[in-house]
């Protein structure tokens, strides 16, 4: 596996692969890699001739400076994990390499970027669009792979791709979970013992909420999920919304969409965890 720290060296690698007619899959990450990330690598390796991963903690998508400072960074371990997963190349740049000067671009990402995470983390998705668009321009991938745990992020990136007219297919990959149901996240390492023990309740309550659908409105299910989680120690729901899986707009009735998704953010202690559940039949 090749490791690149500069844009020039990465582009040179990509150009050689393109000249040989090879297809390229990109897996953008912020490092602290886990089995969820590796599932994306395996998918890219299976579907493309060349798999390129990026490991970069992007400062422009953090609206909380402390969250940025606390984000786990394990570059040596990440490189070893990627090599073992048969990734062909990894891009591990400095902030200065990605942003030689401030990125002042503001993207019109539409309503999918204004709700939920967009409402609670102002500027977050614009920062995501900044870094992902840069990576797409550097690598020019045929496909890019993202995990469905970040359900809204996938919708936002698809919006950005349409806005910029980029020739890349966005591949959404299933959430990978621990045996107890907790969605894998780089932030999970920050959970204390008691917090880690209670965190799987998020997925459990979401799963139970599916059984309420036949006899209850989306609003009633939303209220039940929120109250059930808030009643547990260490957990505080920031938001839970049941939305149309394409527009991400809240639904009032199940009949409003055939692709209902419940998106949730919960503070477990001081750690912000996200998850979602599909209410499709």
UniProtKB/Swiss-Prot annotation:
Further details from the record: The reaction proceeds by a bi uni uni bi ping pong mechanism.
This protein's name: Pantothenate synthetase
GO process annotations (BP): pantothenate biosynthetic process
Residues reported to bind ATP: 30-37, 147-150, 176, 184-187
HAMAP family per record: PanC (MF_00158)
Subunit structure: Homodimer.
NCBIfam families: panC (TIGR00018)
């Amino acid at each position: 596996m090749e490791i690149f720290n500069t844009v020039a060296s990465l582009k040179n690698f990509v150009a050689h692969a393109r000249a040989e007619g090879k297809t390229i899959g990109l897996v953008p990450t912020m490092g602290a890699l886990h089995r969820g990330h590796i599932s994306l690598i395996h998918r890219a390796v299976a579907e493309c001739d060349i798999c390129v991963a990026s490991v970069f903690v992007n400062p422009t998508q953090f609206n909380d400076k402390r969250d940025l400072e606390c984000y786990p960074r394990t570059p040596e371990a990440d490189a070893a994990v990627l090599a073992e997963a048969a990734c062909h190349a990894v891009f591990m740049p400095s902030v200065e390499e990605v942003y030689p000067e401030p990125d002042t671009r503001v993207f019109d990402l539409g309503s999918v970027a204004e709700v939920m995470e967009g409402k609670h983390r102002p500027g977050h998705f614009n920062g995501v669009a900044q870094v992902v668009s840069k990576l797409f321009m550097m690598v020019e991938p045929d496909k890019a792979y993202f995990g469905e745990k970040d359900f809204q992020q996938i919708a936002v990136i698809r919006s950005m791709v349409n806005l910029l007219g980029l020739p890349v297919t966005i591949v959404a990959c299933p959430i990978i979970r621990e045996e107890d149901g907790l969605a894998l996240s780089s932030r999970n390492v920050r959970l204390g013992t008691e917090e880690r023990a209670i965190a799987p309740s998020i997925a459990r309550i979401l799963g139970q909420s599916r059984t309420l659908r036949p006899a209850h409105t989306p609003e009633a299910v939303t209220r039940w999920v929120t109250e059930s989680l808030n009643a547990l120690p260490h957990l505080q729901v920031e938001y839970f919304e049941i939305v149309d899986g394409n527009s991400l707009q809240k639904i009032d009735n199940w009949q409003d969409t055939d692709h209902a998704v419940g998106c949730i953010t919960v503070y477990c202690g001081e750690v912000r965890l996200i998850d979602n559940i599909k209410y499709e039949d």
